[in-house]
Amino acid sequence: MKKIYDFFNYYVFGKELGVLPGSLAYSFFLAIIPILSLLFYLLSSFNLPLDMVQNFLSDTFPEGVVNLLQPIFTDTITMNSIITLVIAVMVATNGCNAIILASNTIYNIENAPIVRRTIKSLFLTIVMIILIAFVVVVPLFGKSILNILLKVFVGQEKFLTTLFLILRVPVSLVVIFTIIKLLYVVAPDQRISSKYVNRGAAFTAICWLIVTYIYSFYINNIARYDLVYGNLTNIVILLLWFYILAYVFVIGLYLNRHKTDTEIEKTNTYKLEEIRKKVQEEKHKK
């Protein structure tokens, strides 16, 4: 019981959790518009329908938040402008830089030089774009593949539809888990073994899906933030969602840190035992 209490007291309710999630949420909030703009540009380049992004937002957020983000997809964005693209990338990388700094804080690692962190932030920005693209694009492709299979295998509509519904969540979890695991491995400015981040990545991937579903239901059916925040309600809803996701992400970091510390302690204990055995053997030989 004491071990469970110590774990929650240090790793779940640690002092960093009072600061890091808020910092990450604010950075994510500032970075989400540029990231969505870059995603919009990529989708336009491949002639993919943009209504799937709007459908995702409509299914997740209330109408006010969708209207807040709507200009990103309806207004004409001239990505030929080098200045616009550079600014979008710079702002987007700030969010990923916050992930690096949060990881270094949890692992008690000294921050790398700013040039190295900037390069890593660019890479993580690409990873984040892939993650968001998967969340909003893959469901459309999944339905398209299902429609093709239904045309090929006539008479198997019920089986294929059921199989699609069963596999949709596990496949999404696996992909999101893989991307989050990559974030956990790459973000710290020190080499972290990938086998030590599985627990945190699994926890974060599952909780992100559950939290997003519950929060979406709560916002759309129960909460009345407009009574308190008025015209700022839509911004508050986004910030609160980012804060919850960031809180889960930081707890995942703590789980990885706990796993890393435990494995290092086991390794050191094993090495110490080996040294003791060798010393005893040397004494017996003498």
Regions found by a protein language model. Give the residues of each.
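Membrane-embedded alpha-helices and immediately adjacent juxtamembrane helical segments
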Residues: 1-286
